[in-house]
């Protein structure tokens, strides 16, 4: 396992040349609609060196040609989306050469980039989740997603690398395997993971079926971008329908409520 100390973004390598997009598969594309009409199409491309190119158009993706996509792409400055490493911080570097099929590389929420330009929302979100995963990795739990480490490029934390699992609980309940599930054991395993977080002084704050993966019939808790120490102010709230009331700080009671609701949901699922 490798560690990295604080690095300075001053020693940056030169940016890569603007990428040549050859097909829509080279892009992540989000179409924004309102009242049945297209507002805009945003798209981005991430290079192998974690450089991000972003663009938008008023056309839908089917009406936009590959040359038009290429022309619209502009380099996003690292500091707009990635955090630098805080002083006196030791980070676990994800091993190079991990199979792409076995890991999930979690990057900043670039679908929010255009809306959040000029704020520190995206860099802070990456840093917060990285530091939480570092803390959890020092006291791992079998029902919490495995953290391999983060990636650092040009002095910035560009992504975190996690175990890849294929099925959320929302998806799992629609399969025949769900009929054989020991719901009591499943829930107790999930509860154990949440209680483990609480012993670390952390609340997840967003427990719902889409943030629980299923591995060999057991739950694995994921998505720690709202997980913070008790009492800390949050940037993002829980998922609508899974919290008792709107909240702005991290609290154990949010998890307790969500667990109770999830237990009811699990028992009702057929």
Put a short name on every predicted segment:
Residues 42, 215-270:
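C-lobe/activation-segment region of protein kinase-like
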Residues 2-71:
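Long, solvent-exposed N-terminal ectodomains/accessory regions
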Residues 104, 109-127, 134-137, 143-186:
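Conserved structural core of kinase catalytic domains
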Residues 198-215:
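Catalytic-loop of the protein kinase fold
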Residues 128, 189, 258:
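Charged catalytic carboxylate motif
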Residues 44-138:
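ATP-binding glycine-rich loop module of kinase domains
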Residues 182-196:
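Conserved alphaE helix
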